């Protein structure tokens, strides 16, 4: 079955959305201007929350608006949680949670994480940070495992789709360093294969959110422990 460039264009819309988000994330002038309006102790928190909301808007809402407003029927979004999603999520979580806890101890890791740099957290901020991770990753996985994988399957087939997606996924991690970039390759392949079997984005989203939450909890713990040891 052949599809027109018009029908495939949400792929380009999604990629443009990601680039808009990335530009915003890495624009130091915007970040400095934003932080000037906030107290130094809270500026990191609010900046990160803003970037995550923007990411969801660019990677999910923008492509969805394009799909629905222009009636591109090929891009029907009907992701339903399945039993297979539950099974794969539990298996991967059991493997990745302890690995994440161990990895969070590393000094190189603590240079990057946790993303929000605050000495004092209250319960609302702590939980909201976890929730905003979920919002961000829902948009992220809608783009990467939805549009940029399930969306290109009809065009190129399974194995080329896995390769294309894995390359794009690795490129999206380049700014986080060599270790995360290399680590994204096997994870990306596994998530693509599972996504192809379930035909949903939910395992990828759930696993990614579990990993992010686990990483935040342990990175914050080890960072605070390191700070206390330096006193």
Regions found by a protein language model. Give the residues of each.
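Membrane-interface starts of transmembrane alpha-helices
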Residues: 9, 43-55, 124, 128, ...
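Juxtamembrane helix-loop-helix connectors linking adjacent transmembrane helices
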Residues: 37-42, 68-136, 150, 154, ...
